[in-house]
């Protein structure tokens, strides 16, 4: 009896159930997108005049904060980094522009890299985020890496009373 039941079950399964196989191809392109938010606003750094003769110039606290957003998709085992540099004329003598990069904040996910907290900007690229893998930071303000710029006087004898505008470029590069 068991034998008949087993045969009946096997025949029933073949008649009532069927399977088919479909192959699905997935193509994930390499993606490297980088954005600075908010767009179009100039970062204004300045020194305030001292209130009394004999006092040093004061670095005016900048309220201009930028956010660095990125999306990265790359082959397994690969990584990327983000560098920054001044691409316009050479930085005037007597002061330095310092970039402070926070740790990651926001809604993103993946291998978001490690920030280098403080760098001096120059005409040569300087890494600010290393070891980026497949990741996204989220878009807009309060997502990604917070960027804060400041000025430091390094030689009073070289300072000139002038105004300059510097172009700063951020680059997302494969390692």
PLM region spans:
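Bacterial Sec-dependent N-terminal signal peptides
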Residues: 1-23
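N-terminal small/polar-rich segments of proteins
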Residues: 19-110, 127-175
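Surface-exposed loop/turn segments flanking beta-strands in extracellular/periplasmic regions
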Residues: 107-119
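Extracellular beta-sheet repeat scaffolds used for adhesion and glycan interaction
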Residues: 120-126
């Amino acid at each position: 009896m068991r034998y008949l039941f087993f045969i009946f079950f096997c025949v029933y399964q073949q008649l009532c159930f069927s399977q088919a196989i479909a192959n699905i191809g997935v193509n994930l392109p390499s993606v490297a997108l980088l954005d600075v938010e908010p767009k179009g606003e100039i970062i204004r750094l300045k020194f305030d005049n001292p209130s009394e003769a004999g006092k040093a110039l004061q670095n005016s606290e900048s309220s201009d904060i930028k956010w660095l957003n990125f999306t990265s998709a790359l082959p397994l085992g690969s990584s990327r980094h983000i560098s920054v540099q001044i691409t316009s004329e050479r930085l005037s003598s007597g002061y330095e522009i310092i970039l402070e990069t926070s740790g990651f904040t926001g809604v993103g996910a993946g291998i978001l890299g490690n920030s280098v907290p403080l760098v001096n900007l120059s005409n040569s690229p300087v890494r600010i985020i290393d070891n980026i893998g497949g990741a996204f930071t989220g878009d807009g303000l309060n997502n990604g890496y917070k960027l804060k710029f400041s000025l430091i006087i390094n030689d009073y004898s070289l300072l000139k009373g002038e105004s300059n505008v510097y172009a700063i470029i951020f680059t997302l590069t494969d390692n």
